[in-house]
Amino acid sequence: MYWQLVRILVLFDCLQKILAIEHDSICIADVDDACPEPSHTVMRLRERNDKKAHLIAKQHGLEIRGQPFLDGKSYFVTHISKQRSRRRKREIISRLQEHPDILSIEEQRPRVRRKRDFLYPDIAHELAGSSTNIRHTGLISNTEPRIDFIQHDAPVLPFPDPLYKEQWYLNNGAQGGFDMNVQAAWLLGYAGRNISVSILDDGIQRDHPDLAANYDPLASTDINGHDDDPTPQDDGDNKHGTRCAGEVASIAGNVYCGVGVAFHAKIGGVRMLDGPVSDSVEAASLSLNRHHIDIYSASWGPEDDGRTFDGPGPLAREAFYRGVKAGRGGKGSIFVWASGNGGSRQDSCSADGYTTSVYTLSVSSATIDNRSPWYLEECPSTIATTYSSANMNQPAIITVDVPHGCTRSHTGTSASAPLAAGIIALALEANPNLTWRDMQHIVLRTANPVPLLNNPGWSVNGVGRRINNKFGYGLMDAGALVKLALIWKTVPEQHICTYDYKLEKPNPRPITGNFQMNFSLEVNGCESGTPVLYLEHVQVLATFRFGKRGDLKLTLFSPRGTSSVLLPPRPQDFNSNGIHKWPFLSVQTWGEDPRGKWTLMVESVSTNRNVGGTFHDWSLLLYGTAEPAQPNDPRHSSVVPSSVSAESPFDRITQHIASQEKKKKQRDSRDWQPKKVENKKSLLVSAQPELRV
């Protein structure tokens, strides 16, 4: 009997290990870490019925802990008993999947999400021991580095708030006397009245003296704690959301801290980063009270480590879509996103599915000397830029701090997104009828490239606008934005054309070592459906595998000659799984005529001849309108431009490369002992695409 019991226990232990291995294999993704326990379970009924949902949950030892969406069909559920085994939990979930009233039930695992601020590298070790117990002397944190601020002439609007004069980004304080022209919007009478902004983060201190009068409970909730109070835990680490909120809506004239960009706006916060973050947590945050909240500001995202591809899950993607379709009474929620802080690791925001979403307005950073900070990431989905800082010797962003204080050292792209949200609030007050697409149009049209032109990487797109992979269309200009908002007409309906590239045999195509391949599509503007003649967003969905994913570079060439580096090389990305239909996004061809030849250049910077993989497919998604965005905009010709059917800019680039290779071979042939030249293999592939409208 004793040995039988021992054998049973050993068998049970082995079975548990097998189940654990199977469990880990289910969630192998883009990282090598072990699979964590599910953090949330979402149950979705076929029809809305709260009473039935609670009854089903109770019958299975579960309880309802809120809803991720406003549709009433979806519910967070948790196991009442904390002692249930993993196997028992699986049995319950499996049984519920067969329930006739349940459409789906899904266990969700936590996702890695990082706030996009940082400690200055040269002082991080000094603050490590005290960062969890920050106290304030007067208004300013005594743990912050000493910064000598440049003093400027008194601002036009003499607010008595003690740190206002030090808010250089509002007071012509950047090099050359530049700022974001916010005072011009204020002088027109706009400060964000009747606009509600919600900060999706680690919570906000709603009773802060510089926020309390503007606090909006309808734009706030605590998803981590399952209640309505977004107050963060007082552990020293959860100040990020409060700081972001202060940038938007710090009260003006109360002789405390500084002044928010939209100091009359209503400000709320969602506590969602102070705990496990799953797809459903993100969806619930992005869906909160969408008919009341105008702007959602997020300064977080996946790891900025130079080796991760990650983005919103299916529920969060659904939340984005529902937001732009139904939010703000059908005008669309406005989602503002920080572009990322992985520049020092040569990361690209193209690998971040939040900044590459069509539905987000991605914002970058510039320093007081109008340069790119060391942490800045590059990608063609960035629309515009606001100010931040780069190191401890430069002034950073002034805002409120926890507990009940102020700070001079808010930084990173975390600081840039809330400034953009505040500026957008000014424009929405000027014209509340602006749709989410209207806002993207006027932000890129009024962005000012001039302060940032001394940086490398600027080019001109096919409609004459300056573009940059670091800064988008330039520095946001609040005054210009408000003035354009006042006269802006709602843009025509957006249409989408999809072109699928049909890869000829061999399919998939082998790729090895150091190579270059060019895949071209002829686009006719969707003649068989509603045409897209004036571009907005352009997406490329690509699938490939390669021995070292970070060695690949993807560049898209438009018919008008605009080149967008969709994916630069990322030296730290050693992943060999590749990507599957990843949605790369470019906003750099905005306004162009899409008709003509589009070319996707896929190349490798690998120095290893033996590394290889396969290229499977790619699709081109064109978002835009059949008519000009505004009545007075120039119209494209009804005939495909002759420059498209003739030699395109991409053809000239290809010919130049071939010419240089030919000259190099001729030089080598004249040598007594010719050197071995390893030229890139170039394969130009053209095919008629399959068109889906």
Swiss-Prot record:
Annotated keywords: Autocatalytic cleavage, Calcium, Cleavage on pair of basic residues, Disulfide bond, Glycoprotein, Hydrolase, Metal-binding, Protease, Secreted, Serine protease, Signal, Zymogen
Q: Where is the composition biased (Basic and acidic residues)?
A: 668-681
Q: Which InterPro entries match?
A: Galactose-bd-like_sf (IPR008979), Kexin/furin (IPR034182), P_dom (IPR002884), Peptidase_S8/S53_dom (IPR000209), Peptidase_S8/S53_dom_sf (IPR036852), Peptidase_S8_Asp-AS (IPR023827), Peptidase_S8_His-AS (IPR022398), Peptidase_S8_Ser-AS (IPR023828)
* Matching Pfam families: P_proprotein, Peptidase_S8, S8_pro-domain
Query: Which residues does the UniProt record annotate as the domain Peptidase S8?
Result: 167-482
Question: Can you tell me which residues bind substrate?
Answer: 202, 237-238, 282, 299-304, 310, 338-341, 352, 354, 414
**Which coenzymes or cofactors are required?**
Ca(2+)
Q: Where is the signal peptide?
A: 1-20
Q: Pro-sequence positions in this chain? A: 21-116
Domain of life of the organism encoding this protein? Eukaryota
Per the UniProt record, the site (Cleavage, first) maps to R116, D117
Its biological purpose is as follows: Serine endoprotease which cleaves substrates at the RX(K/R)R consensus motif.
Would you tell me the protein name for this molecule? Endoprotease bli
Q: What is the lineage of its organism?
A: Eukaryota, Metazoa, Ecdysozoa, Nematoda, Chromadorea
